[in-house]
Design a protein with these regions (language model features):
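Glycine-rich beta-alpha loop segments
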Residues: 1
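Conserved phosphate- and dinucleotide-binding cores of soluble alpha/beta proteins
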Residues: 6, 10-168
């Protein structure tokens, strides 16, 4: 099966290239955000707007019951919204520390995801948000293995998607 990992994050691209020899990696172009390792801007958005993605894996700076998933940078929010919109299946990946007051800009709500994966749900905040919003998202609580957590160090709010290449 041909798998292509699409990301705007240099750390994710490097990790995937080094550790997933059967996967192709598409690093989205764009403006490199100062002091971060990911691309944003109109070039990134233009490329994303042309892609059809099977699965999107999105992270967040914070989650708040009232405000949803938020991030600190507007350009990052735009990329996340596009990835979510272009994917058939959408996953939020977050740890419990992200349940906190909102960051600067909202990019999604629980209704935008098929699955939300976390290490645990503090005080049932995520489950309550899913129920209160009539969302269809599955909530999965999974403690990551220590080696998996340490394997890739990225800005904790980055995203990537997977698409299949069609031969011929």
């Amino acid at each position: 099966r041909n798998i292509t990992i699409v990301t705007s994050d240099l750390s994710i691209a490097t990790f995937a290239d080094s550790n997933l020899p059967r996967a192709d990696v598409l690093l989205l172009g764009g403006a490199l955000r100062k002091n971060h390792r990911y691309m944003t801007g109109s070039i990134t958005n233009e490329i994303l707007g042309r892609l059809h993605l099977d699965k999107a894996f999105v992270a967040t700076d914070s989650f708040h019951e009232e405000y949803g998933f938020t991030t600190e940078f507007t350009g990052n929010a735009d990329v996340k919204r596009l990835i979510i919109r272009r994917a058939k299946e959408r996953f939020m990946i977050m740890d419990a520390s992200k349940v906190r007051p909102p960051s600067f800009i909202q990019f999604a709500t629980v209704n935008d995801f098929d699955t939300i994966i976390t290490d645990y749900d503090p005080d049932g905040v995520l489950a309550r948000a899913i129920a209160d919003n009539g969302a269809h998202a599955r909530l999965i609580e999974a403690k990551p293995e220590r080696s998996a957590r340490e394997s890739v160090r990225t800005d904790s709010s980055e995203s990537f998607a997977i698409g299949r290449q069609v031969d011929g």
